[in-house]
């Protein structure tokens, strides 16, 4: 069952965590979420990692198998947009905010964290210094920073961070299912009650979806719920998406039977990926979002030519390939 709330300064429920454990595990550089711009930096193709399924890559394959290939196998670079980078900065600020003593988690302090967060992002990704172009007189940058502050204001309308003590922030979670598929993702925030109940929180810098699109929005959260269920043996009590632009929350309470079904869905997606990976037959799926795709010029649906298929990535060439084991 899902439910929505709007900006009402929601207080933490009685089962909110009271202890402070902050195992900030692995921030990494993988293209895992909307705020980690997918494939935005070139990857050393000489280094092969064991393929894993993340929420973003699973969604890519469902939407367009060729896009999955470009991002997960070819690891082609993409240039993030100002909107995407704004999301990165907002997430960085909220992560930093929860590192402060509870009494200091105030709107003014969050705004003070924006400029340092933006500076760190530029240091990690120097190419983003040209985000607004050489012709910018500073007004575009100022407007962009102001819009970042507005998203933070939206967050404070949804929640009082002084009442929440997360167990973890930017938490890397990973588990292997019985079928062999490796699931991996980053959770923005994990809250744990003294009773052991878990709440998964994800920040979105956009607006809440319409009700008929809720299932698509919750795909990512159910993914995290499956991983936590398999890692800890506990079904999260609540999955919460916080949409900062229009100050709405979408909450969902999963159950074990539903997560078991969703696990089978992930298995099916992975088997389809392996089947395509065997031959490199990742087909395009043209649609209304193609105009915003960074790879449109190399897509055969629009007269382009994809790069030569590099083959399925395996960490050890001496091992039997997962693709070889696929039906």
Roles of regions detected by a PLM:
Residues 82, 86, 90, 144, ...:
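Hydrophobic (often cysteine-bearing) scaffold residues that line and stabilize catalytic clefts
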Residues 258-294:
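Polybasic (Lys/Arg-rich)
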Residues 171-268:
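Mg2+/Mn2+-dependent nuclease catalytic core
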Residues 302-312:
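Short cysteine/histidine-rich zinc-coordinating motifs and their immediately flanking basic loops
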Residues 64, 290-293, 299:
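Short cysteine clusters
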Residues 74-83, 100-105, 210-211, 280-281:
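Short, polar/flexible loop-turn hinges at active-site or ligand-entry regions and domain interfaces
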Residues 1-84, 315-327:
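C-terminal, charged and often intrinsically disordered regions of DNA end-processing helicases
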């Amino acid at each position: 069952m899902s439910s929505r709330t709007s900006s009402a300064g929601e207080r933490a429920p009685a089962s909110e965590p009271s202890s402070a454990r902050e195992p900030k595990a692995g921030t990494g550089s993988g293209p895992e979420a909307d705020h980690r711009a997918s494939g935005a930096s070139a990857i050393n193709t000489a280094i092969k990692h064991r393929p894993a399924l993340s929420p973003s890559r699973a969604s890519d394959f469902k939407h367009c198998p060729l896009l999955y290939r470009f991002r997960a196998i070819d690891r082609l670079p993409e240039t993030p947009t100002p909107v995407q980078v704004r999301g990165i900065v907002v997430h960085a600020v909220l992560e930093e905010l929860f590192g402060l003593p509870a009494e200091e988690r105030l709107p003014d302090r969050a705004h003070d964290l924006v400029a340092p967060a933006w500076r760190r992002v530029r240091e990690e990704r120097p190419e983003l210094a040209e985000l607004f172009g050489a012709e910018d007189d500073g007004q575009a940058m100022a407007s962009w920073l102001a819009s970042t502050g507005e998203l933070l204001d939206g967050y404070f309308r949804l929640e009082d961070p002084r009442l929440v003590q997360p167990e973890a922030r930017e938490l890397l979670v990973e588990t292997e299912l019985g079928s062999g598929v490796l699931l991996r993702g980053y959770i923005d925030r994990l809250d744990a009650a003294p009773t052991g109940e878990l709440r998964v929180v994800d920040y979105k810098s956009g607006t809440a979806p319409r009700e008929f699109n809720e299932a698509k929005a919750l795909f990512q959260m159910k993914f995290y719920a499956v991983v936590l269920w398999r890692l800890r043996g506990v079904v999260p009590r609540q999955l919460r998406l916080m949409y900062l632009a229009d100050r709405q929350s979408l909450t969902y309470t999963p159950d074990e039977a539903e997560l078991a079904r969703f696990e089978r869905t992930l298995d099916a997606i992975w088997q389809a990926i392996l089947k395509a990976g065997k031959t490199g037959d990742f087909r395009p799926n043209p649609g209304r979002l193609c105009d915003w795709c960074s790879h449109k010029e190399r897509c055969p649906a629009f007269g382009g030519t994809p790069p030569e298929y590099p083959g399925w990535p395996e960490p050890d060439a001496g091992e039997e390939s997962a693709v070889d084991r696929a039906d």
